[in-house]
């Protein structure tokens, strides 16, 4: 579902990020240097890493990191086939919990580069984002660097449409949480009695996603019961938006 969201005309993030990588490859390569050791958090698709590795001068290694074993192996195999001169590795893990890199990674001795595209950093609060960057700094060492995707503040109508596409893929993605609760946690929930809501909260500078109850109802699972009034919501996700100045300050305060 998320891959379908990325292909919708409303969701600008993916195509814009790929365009940025393609159009600024020379500058990015000059900053990173030759024989780089690249690792990627959340390697769901090979499109972006292909654009980056194509721009870099003789990249030495690529380490794919993802919690989904299926996506991880698929991406690693694809990159290995496309870039036969690059040493490719794969680590199935939650990147939020990584504290050490595999000993075999970074054999060239060059400081690692973390590639973290997709504006995933926006799903954390600004405070959490700072803590995350601090952990990454410790992981990469003093000379390591990060190439990160950050979504900037923009017209709220553009943001609202991006998280509520006309084809309904984002709505299905959000409602899938209830389906998984029902199927995997054996929750008693009527999925059809909720609907998707997304809007830009200007005061908090974030897009919020909610599941809204259409009626008075209860959800029961694992011995607990949750009562909902009509129009009461489950707040499922945030996506914070920054100015360049705001995010730069967070990065600088946490070692970058």
Language-model-detected regions and their locations in the chain:
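Conserved beta-strand signature within the Rossmann-like core of class I S-adenosyl-L-methionine
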Residues: 139-153
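A short SAM/SAH-binding and catalytic strip from SAM-dependent methyltransferases
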Residues: 109-133
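Conserved SAM-binding loop of SAM-dependent methyltransferases across substrates and taxa
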Residues: 45-58
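A short glycine-rich, Lys/Arg-flanked "PGG" loop and its adjoining helix->strand segment in the class I
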Residues: 130-142
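Class I SAM-dependent methyltransferase Rossmann-like catalytic core
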Residues: 2-32
């Amino acid at each position: 579902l998320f891959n379908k969201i990325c292909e919708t005309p409303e969701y600008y993030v993916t195509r814009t990020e790929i365009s940025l990588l393609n159009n600024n490859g020379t500058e990015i390569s000059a900053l990173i240097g030759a024989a780089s050791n690249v690792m990627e958090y959340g390697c769901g698709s090979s499109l972006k890493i292909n654009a980056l590795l194509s721009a870099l001068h003789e990249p030495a290694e690529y380490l794919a990191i993802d919690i989904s074993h299926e996506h991880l192996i698929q991406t690693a195999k694809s990159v290995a086939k496309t870039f036969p001169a690059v040493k490719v590795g794969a680590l199935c893990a939650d990147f939020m919990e990584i504290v050490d890199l595999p000993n075999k990674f970074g054999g060239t001795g060059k400081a690692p580069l973390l590639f973290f595209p997709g504006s995933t950093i926006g799903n954390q609060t600004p405070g959490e984002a700072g803590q995350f960057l601090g952990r990454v700094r410790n992981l990469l060492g003093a000379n390591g660097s990060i190439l990160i995707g950050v979504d900037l503040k923009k017209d709220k109508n553009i943001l609202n449409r991006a998280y509520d596409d006309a084809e309904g893929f984002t709505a299905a993605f959000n409602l899938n949480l209830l389906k998984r609760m029902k199927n995997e946690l054996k929750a008693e929930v009527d999925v059809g009695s909720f609907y998707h809501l997304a809007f830009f909260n200007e005061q908090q500078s974030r897009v919020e996603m909610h599941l809204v109850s259409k009626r008075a109802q209860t959800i029961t699972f694992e011995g607990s019961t949750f009562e909902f009034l009509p129009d009461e919501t489950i707040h499922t996700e945030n996506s914070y938006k920054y100015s360049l100045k705001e995010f730069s300050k967070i990065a600088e305060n946490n070692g970058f």
